[in-house]
């Protein structure tokens, strides 16, 4: 082995090719591990032998291809392990649900969620929160904020008595996730106890 490869960053869906120079006499045999688990010969990671290098290929990279690899290269003289770290660059996964709705009033509601399980190789920069008045149609999503930094947000300016759905999207420098949606719509209204208070 002439050198150790650095961390490889590859965009989701692209093909990763890593050329690793070697010195010695073939033929060589290869065994691949990912995160300390042996991968079968028929797995997605392909290792090809050339005169003075080996070529590691992962086609159509998926999120699950990210991780730490170890490639054991062996010939009649001995063996060595080549470490290879793969980072998949992609938009984050959706925020982790459920999307909880609390503190519902006649003109507001508070949303809470958890961060995505996969940030796509880059830090989550924030969240986009959207609302939909169900009386306006299935595509009437309106952004409430495009720069929420926390995993909770109080949606303002709801209309008393109207029914709403909500959704939250995560974003990073690579793009925007699919949305996490509320499981069912809620009606903006005063809680029953507050209505009784105002009647008295």
Tell me what each language-model feature is.
Residues 1-5, 34-41, 48-53, 75-77, ...:
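Flexible inter-domain hinge/linker segments at boundaries of tandem extracellular adhesion modules
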Residues 7-9, 43-64, 68-77, 117-118, ...:
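Extracellular beta-strand/loop-rich beta-sandwich domains predominantly from IgSF
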Residues 15, 25-27, 64-68, 79, ...:
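Extracellular Ig-like/FN3 beta-sandwich strand-entry sites
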Residues 20-25, 74, 114-120, 132:
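Acidic, Ser/Thr
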Residues 26-33, 109, 123-127:
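Solvent-exposed loop segments of extracellular immunoglobulin-like
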Residues 107-122, 200:
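Conserved aromatic anchor
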Residues 155-176:
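Beta-strand-rich modules
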């Amino acid at each position: 082995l002439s050198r150790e490869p650095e961390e490889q960053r590859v965009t989701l869906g692209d093909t990763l090719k890593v050329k690793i120079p070697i010195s010695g006499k073939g033929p060589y045999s290869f065994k691949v591990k990912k995160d300390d688990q042996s991968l079968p010969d028929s797995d997605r990671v392909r290792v090809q032998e050339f005169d003075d290098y080996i070529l590691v290929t992962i086609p159509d990279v998926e999120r699950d291809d990210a991780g730490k690899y170890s490639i054991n290269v062996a010939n009649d003289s001995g063996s060595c392990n080549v470490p290879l770290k793969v980072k998949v660059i992609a938009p984050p996964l959706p925020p982790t649900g459920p999307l909880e709705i609390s503190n519902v009033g006649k003109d507001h509601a508070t949303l809470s969620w958890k961060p995505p399980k996969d940030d796509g190789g880059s830090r989550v920069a924030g969240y986009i929160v959207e609302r939909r008045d169900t009386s306006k149609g299935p595509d009437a999503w309106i952004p409430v904020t495009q720069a929420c930094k926390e995993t909770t947000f109080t949606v303002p300016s709801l209309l008393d008595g109207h029914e709403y759905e909500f959704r939250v999207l995560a974003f990073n420098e690579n793009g925007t996730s699919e949305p996490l949606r509320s499981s069912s719509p809620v009606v903006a209204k005063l809680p029953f106890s507050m209505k009784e208070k105002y009647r008295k």
